């Protein structure tokens, strides 16, 4: 199955496989945790039981997703010590403390308050329960902050020196944590998590509205999700624009691959909408493009010059085809999310938000696209950094542990089988929970006389139920 592949290729495949499974759960957990905090706060403020019903509905889904995220994340840490021990040795003085801070602060905060949030409402009081819910939401955001700081440092390293052993040594922790790409990546990822959650909530709400458009919790969750889409989707597009400009400054080869610019454009670069990258001929075949627009987007100036991959040595060039397509999947889905939010806003204005079945079906179809967009975005980010693990300083080929290809292949095959079984079952269970009714139906009254617990029959007013007649 993996014949002819090197240990480096297999190790990269293994990490890509495990991190792809992992990222979808934290992305969902971040959004759902904040959603639960909002629901709990609204219930405390209004005492509207619809919010409490939604809180109880989504907290169970959050618990399962959170657990799957924790389990899938453990595996990746072991790979740093097995397949990528050289990387761990060289970057450990910088990245080790950051990852420890994530555990000591964010994860402990989440773990400490999670039980109170899930089971403590009747035991600790409403206000303390609200505090616990807010702390879980804050913990997920803090966890994202530390992990994205680590990843951003690998993309745009700062605040370090290199000792005689070739290790990165911290010199300025402020520069390390708040490295040049960190603020943009943090905002972009958190907004992606909120969009992902809004799409899932909207899809679930749309499903239940198709079954019963009078379902009050379904109406509320669908309305909240559509508000989130129309507000956050434009912000995400704007954040992506700023992130792209920052990436052009610090990682120009990545942006050149994203845009498909093999050649430099001294008089302005076109925006290539679609095409087929041809790495052998260094061109985009069958390109559909709009003149000058790439320069306008990246430099906010019509006709501004843009360098191409012809200015990058071949050995430093990232895999263009993968980045080219993953970037377009991410951007295309982003605009589709904006379109869904705008459609919902129009139907809300017309007073038909809960009556337009086509909109509800579209929300169901769009439900999983947030996860696809997150995966496409991370493929763009991580593959675009190649051939480096620490951009411009440490190559991927120099980060690998001295492991044999058959050993990596065996562990990769084991991961594939175990992951699809365990996380497939977990995902199936999550889908069943989302398919369940938003609230328990009232027990149906049986036909016939209603009697008390005693032996005396109750008075009946229905002549059809009077015995003997």
Regions found by a protein language model. Give the residues of each.
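Polytopic transmembrane helical bundles with strong interfacial aromatic enrichment
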Residues: 1-469
